[in-house]
From Swiss-Prot:
GO CC annotation: cytoplasm
Motif PP-loop motif in this chain: 47-52
Name the record gives this protein: tRNA-cytidine(32) 2-sulfurtransferase
Domain of life, per lineage: Bacteria
Gene designation: ttcA
Originating species: Shigella boydii serotype 18 (strain CDC 3083-94 / BS512)
Function: Catalyzes the ATP-dependent 2-thiolation of cytidine in position 32 of tRNA, to form 2-thiocytidine (s(2)C32). The sulfur atoms are provided by the cysteine/cysteine desulfurase (IscS) system.
Lineage: Bacteria, Pseudomonadati, Pseudomonadota, Gammaproteobacteria, Enterobacterales
Enzyme Commission number: 2.8.1.-
Major subcellular site: cytoplasm
Note: The thiolation reaction likely consists of two steps: a first activation step by ATP to form an adenylated intermediate of the target base of tRNA, and a second nucleophilic substitution step of the sulfur (S) atom supplied by the hydrosulfide attached to the Fe-S cluster.
Amino acid sequence: MQENQQITKKEQYNLNKLQKRLRRNVGEAIADFNMIEEGDRIMVCLSGGKDSYTMLEILRNLQQSAPINFSLVAVNLDQKQPGFPEHVLPVYLEKLGVEYKIVEENTYGIVKEKIPEGKTTCSLCSRLRRGILYRTATELGATKIALGHHRDDILQTLFLNMFYGGKMKGMPPKLMSDDGKHIVIRPLAYCREKDIQRFADAKAFPIIPCNLCGSQPNLQRQVIADMLRDWDKRYPGRIETMFSAMQNVVPSHLCDTNLFDFKGITHGSEVVNGGDLAFDREEIPLQPAGWQPEEEENQLDELRLNVVEVK
């Protein structure tokens, strides 16, 4: 949908409903993890992709009605990739009236020099970007760094670590940076990628494709993403259930001795988390936990979001 096209009442209604859902998801994540506090200066990392555009739009929207005051500054890292449209983001951000900074660093040249042809560039590229963004956050006096990773990214990372790294480790909604100086937040942690895609299409954001890493075929992350997408089509509700599982961890029923003192279990020990179910069949719900049909979800949105229409 182009910005200059007149949209129908139904399209506007659907867009309003979608924006309210994303706004609710972001608001809940912010509240659950205390992502944003009074007086925060949030550095919004804007890549030019659908996720970061959506994050900026929803944070700007929340800024107008939030019970606390916080400011936003958008930051884009121009990595000097051939053909990168340097004018797109400045024009877009100036039109919005958003404070911004474009950081120019030739990380593209470094990656191409260091990584052999045909090898994945993501690891080195992300390390270089991270250091530059931390430095920029310090220069701008930012108290939080906001990244545009969503629920699907978090699940993909969980499976990547399980399949290839031998760890049950996802992507935290909030963390202290590895240099110990910055707090990183992921406001889209509860948002579905398909909602973000629909919103970005409807808003006609000026998307800038990543020619450095996002287009590389057969990446491990892409394989995982395709697997999860297939599961979502074949088994509705599975994605929601898996994400719910990440929020309901039972250490006593796993095998990590750092999380639970198995050696300390002796006769007379307190029963923990239901005790021994080894000889019983645990009751499994007929429907996936946390899932509901699209129609019911839309009806719930109407009840939850009885607010003034989002413009």
